[in-house]
């Protein structure tokens, strides 16, 4: 198609292959972003394939609408959180889907706009909300109002930063004198909090992990992912597949555990001699290890370097007729 966007969806070929996209499929893109994955899946699904795309970012959804417009009524876009997909499916009259995708990454549209506050290459307000129209806590509010203990926990858990304590103390110390309201100021505070020897040898700016941690906290990203993973098996047709692309070790571990639990018949504690949970496997894991981008894709799109793809397939319901 002409006029393709600069946006490059990560692991697109692998997503299409592992989801088994074929003509006529009903596809849920729970984080449509700029529409790159949806466009690729629509092409693979042929003239009868349909995509229901969700995103809570109004700007991203608007861009996706422009690039997906040539597909007409084969695409329906809804501004909402990925965790709310069951209600959207019901409204669309889709009882089950044949394929579902969730990409937990950020789009260049979000990262490159200083007014959104996701990065610090250019100064801007400390916002970081993906769905600003919905209100909610901003990064500025979190930085200036959260206790030392909460800041430390957020930066340590979501940013996996060994200097979390020093950074949290520095933030609290600075905000006692003046509010921290911009991305540049926060980046400066974090920079100064790092030991000089760490700054000298760091492979990335010391503030990178803190910004990631605050963004994940503001947008409740792990809770959103967990809710999606819990609900999706109920909404996959037998043989339907779900793919999740993560960019953070916490996200990947969450996906791995969720898939493993749904691929296991009994989830009772190990000390339980007799099964009492009644749980039966609903998924079959198709990726024993996460699929990662090859060297060529990483050269072409550095964002793909940390992407990890896991895929699982819906098993027939217990008692269903699976005979040929």
UniProtKB/Swiss-Prot annotation:
Enzyme class: transferase
SUPFAM superfamilies, alphabetized: Putative methyltransferase TM0872, insert domain, S-adenosyl-L-methionine-dependent methyltransferases
Chain sites annotated for binding S-adenosyl-L-methionine: 35-37, 55, 85, 103, 110
InterPro entries: RsmH, SAM-dep_MeTrfase_MraW_recog, SAM-dependent_MTases_sf
Record's subcellular location: Cytoplasm
Keyword field: Cytoplasm, Methyltransferase, rRNA processing, S-adenosyl-L-methionine, Transferase
Bridged cysteine pairs (disulfide): none
Record field: catalytic activity: cytidine(1402) in 16S rRNA + S-adenosyl-L-methionine = N(4)-methylcytidine(1402) in 16S rRNA + S-adenosyl-L-homocysteine + H(+)
Pfam families: Methyltransf_5 (PF01795)
A GO molecular function held by the record: rRNA (cytosine-N4-)-methyltransferase activity
The EC number(s) this enzyme carries: 2.1.1.199
Any one of the GO CC terms: cytoplasm
GO biological process, one term: rRNA base methylation
Primary location: cytoplasm
Family affiliation: Belongs to the methyltransferase superfamily. RsmH family.
NCBIfam families tied to this protein: 16S rRNA (cytosine(1402)-N(4))-methyltransferase RsmH
Function: Specifically methylates the N4 position of cytidine in position 1402 (C1402) of 16S rRNA.
Family matches, as PANTHER family: 12S RRNA N4-METHYLCYTIDINE METHYLTRANSFERASE (PTHR11265:SF0), S-ADENOSYL-METHYLTRANSFERASE MRAW (PTHR11265)
Protein name from the UniProt record: Ribosomal RNA small subunit methyltransferase H
Naturally occurring in which organism (per UniProt): Solidesulfovibrio magneticus (strain ATCC 700980 / DSM 13731 / RS-1) (Desulfovibrio magneticus)
């Amino acid at each position: 198609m002409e006029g393709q966007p600069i946006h490059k969806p990560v692991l697109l070929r692998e997503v299409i292959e592992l989801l088994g996209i074929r003509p006529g499929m009903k596809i849920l893109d729970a984080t449509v972003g700029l529409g790159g994955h949806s466009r690729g899946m629509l092409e693979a699904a042929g003239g009868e394939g349909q995509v229901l795309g969700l995103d809570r970012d109004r700007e991203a959804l608007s861009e996706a609408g422009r690039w997906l417009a040539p597909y007409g009524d084969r695409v329906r876009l809804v501004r909402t959180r990925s965790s709310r997909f069951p209600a959207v499916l019901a409204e669309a009259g889709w009882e089950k889907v044949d394929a579902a995708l969730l990409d937990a990454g950020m789009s260049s549209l979000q990262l490159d706009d200083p007014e959104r506050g996701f990065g610090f290459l250019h100064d801007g307000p400390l916002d970081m909300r993906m769905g600003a129209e919905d209100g909610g806590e901003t990064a500025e509010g979190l930085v200036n109002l959260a206790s030392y203990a909460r800041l430390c926990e957020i930066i340590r858990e979501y940013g996996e930063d060994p200097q979390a304590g020093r950074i949290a103390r520095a933030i609290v110390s600075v905000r006692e004198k003046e509010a921290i309201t911009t991305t540049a100021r926060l980046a400066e505070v974090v920079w100064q909090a790092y030991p000089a020897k760490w700054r000298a040898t760091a492979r990335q700016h010391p503030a990178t992990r803190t910004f990631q941690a605050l963004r994940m906290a503001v947008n409740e990203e792990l809770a959103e992912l967990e809710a999606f993973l819990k609900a999706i098996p109920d909404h996959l047709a037998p043989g339907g597949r779900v793919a999740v692309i993560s960019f953070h070790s916490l996200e990947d571990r969450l996906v791995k555990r969720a898939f493993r639990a749904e691929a296991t018949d009994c989830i009772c504690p190990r000390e339980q001699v007799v099964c009492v949970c009644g749980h039966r496997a609903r998924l079959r894991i198709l990726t024993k290890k996460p699929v990662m981008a090859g060297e060529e894709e990483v050269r072409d799109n550095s964002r793909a370097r940390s992407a990890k793809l896991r895929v699982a397939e819906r098993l027939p319901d217990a008692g269903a007729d699976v005979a040929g």
